């Protein structure tokens, strides 16, 4: 499937973006392990999150959907054993499902095989295999790739683990496994990554301590069912923040967006660049800070992003590159090598497609150099999404300032995180 898009005069309106993908995954997982009935309100019904829901249904958890909410009858920390010797779980394109679920399955007394689509089957899994194996799980893989064959044990061994990367998926897998350990499990990372798991574990009654980049989780006897409301996803809002900033005369309000301080790197750096962004109606919902984001067209200046900021905006970097093409001066992004092992090699994907659009951009092993110019319009052409939802949405926003017509190949992949993206985009274009 491909879509044809054209330059717009300006964007305006009041919109909401889909619920947070990261929080939805975690809410489904912990609700499934809790005792009692949990409600996950305003969950994200995307392809990725549906994989997590189906995985737990397959393992005997009763999950009903009604009017945009999930009603989860928790099975407790011990999931039902498979009737035919092992579970076969298909994770689709979802790295979150695969890695976080691995931590839970490591503490179950049965065998599970996890497979995925072609893209997921190329993504590195050693980062979770190694620590979970140290805790006592028996995990086999295809040379560090899917399929994973996980034979869990209970209890697992406590672990003191220091990661050389700041990745919330690895951290969460270890913390979830720590629920089933025989003692305290501690995780240390170079820079604090998104902390949705820590916040939610605490909400479900888990004894967890956070001290800077250290997190310690203690074994759990049970999780307590919760009523959770999932806020809008800042990573989805980022595309419309970009649209309002780079299309002249634009003024856009995005309501009910989660602005967790471990996810607000994009907003911080954009304000440093001169962006007119206001966070209004700040409040807290289900342990997460939420607000309405008001964005107006702004003349921007270039900025530098390094490894200390990347974990707080890793998913937003592709669309940040687009913004940087419209910021006066040279923007440098480093410390973002993790982009090479996402749904596509996002460093290569972004660089190759923005060169097609006429941008002055060079790739680095761990980032980009962008020579931006606020007076420069991109040139529409045929571009590839590489079946990567964030690349497709970035290119769609780029089309708003591209002369002529932009055709995006494999445009349907946006459904991974943002069903209805093109409809929302069409509604704000004037």
From Swiss-Prot:
Active-site residues, record numbering mapped to chain: 315
Keyword Amino-acid biosynthesis attached: yes
Residues that, per the record, bind phosphoenolpyruvate: 21, 95, 123, 169, 346, 390
MF terms (GO), sorted A to Z: 3-phosphoshikimate 1-carboxyvinyltransferase activity
Disulphide linkage map: none
Reaction(s) the record says it catalyses: 3-phosphoshikimate + phosphoenolpyruvate = 5-O-(1-carboxyvinyl)-3-phosphoshikimate + phosphate
Top-level EC class as recorded in UniProt: transferase
Subcellular location: Cytoplasm
CDD domains per the UniProt record, alphabetical: EPSP_synthase
UniProt record, GO biological process: amino acid biosynthetic process; aromatic amino acid family biosynthetic process; chorismate biosynthetic process
Pathway where it operates: Metabolic intermediate biosynthesis; chorismate biosynthesis; chorismate from D-erythrose 4-phosphate and phosphoenolpyruvate: step 6/7
Binding site for 3-phosphoshikimate: 21-22, 26, 167, 169, 315, 342
NCBIfam families given in the database record: aroA (TIGR01356)
Subunit structure: Monomer.
Family: Belongs to the EPSP synthase family.
Protein name: 3-phosphoshikimate 1-carboxyvinyltransferase
Organism: Endomicrobium trichonymphae
């Amino acid at each position: 499937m491909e879509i044809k898009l054209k330059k717009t005069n300006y964007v305006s309106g009041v919109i909401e973006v889909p619920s947070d993908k990261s929080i939805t995954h975690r809410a489904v997982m912990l609700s499934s392990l809790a005792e009692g009935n949990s409600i996950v309100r305003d969950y994200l019904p995307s392809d990725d999150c549906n994989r997590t829901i189906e995985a737990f249904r397959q393992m005997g958890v009763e999950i009903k959907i009604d009017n945009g909410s999930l009603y989860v009858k928790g099975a407790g920390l011990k999931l039902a054993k498979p009737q035919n010797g092992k579970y076969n779980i298909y994770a689709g394109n979802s790295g979150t499902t695969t890695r976080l679920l691995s931590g839970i399955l490591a503490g179950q007394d049965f065998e599970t095989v996890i497979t995925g689509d072609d893209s997921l089957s190329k993504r590195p899994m050693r980062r979770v295999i190694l620590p979970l194996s140290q805790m006592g799980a028996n995990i086999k893989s295809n040379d560090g790739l899917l399929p994973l064959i996980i034979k869990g044990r209970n209890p697992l061994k406590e672990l003191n683990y220091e990661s050389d990367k700041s990745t919330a998926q690895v951290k969460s897998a270890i913390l979830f496994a720590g629920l089933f350990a025989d003692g305290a499990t501690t995780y240390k990372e170079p820079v604090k990554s998104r902390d949705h798991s820590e916040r939610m574990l605490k909400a479900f009654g888990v004894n967890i301590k956070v001290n800077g980049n250290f997190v310690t989780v203690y074994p759990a006897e049970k999780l307590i069912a919760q009523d959770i409301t999932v806020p809008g996803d800042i990573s989805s809002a980022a595309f419309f923040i970009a649209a309002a900033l780079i299309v002249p005369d634009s003024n856009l309000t995005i309501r009910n967006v989660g602005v967790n301080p471990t996810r607000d790197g994009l907003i911080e750096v954009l304000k440093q660049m001169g962006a007119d962004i206001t966070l209004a109606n700040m409040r807290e919902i289900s342990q997460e800070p939420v607000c309405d984001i008001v964005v107006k067209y702004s003349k921007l200046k270039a900025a530098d992003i390094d490894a200390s900021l990347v974990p707080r905006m890793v998913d937003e970097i592709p669309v940040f590159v687009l913004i940087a093409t419209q910021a006066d001066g040279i923007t440098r992004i480093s410390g973002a090598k993790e982009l090479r092992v996402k749904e596509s090699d996002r460093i290569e994907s972004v660089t190759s497609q923005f060169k097609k659009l006429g941008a002055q951009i060079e790739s680095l092993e761990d980032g980009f150099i962008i020579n931006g110019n606020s007076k420069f319009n991109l040139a529409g052409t045929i571009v590839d999404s590489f079946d990567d939802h964030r690349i497709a949405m970035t290119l769609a926003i780029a089309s708003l300032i591209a002369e002529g017509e932009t055709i995006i190949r494999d445009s349907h992949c946006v459904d991974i995180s943002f069903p209805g993206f093109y409809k929302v985009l069409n509604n704000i274009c004037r």
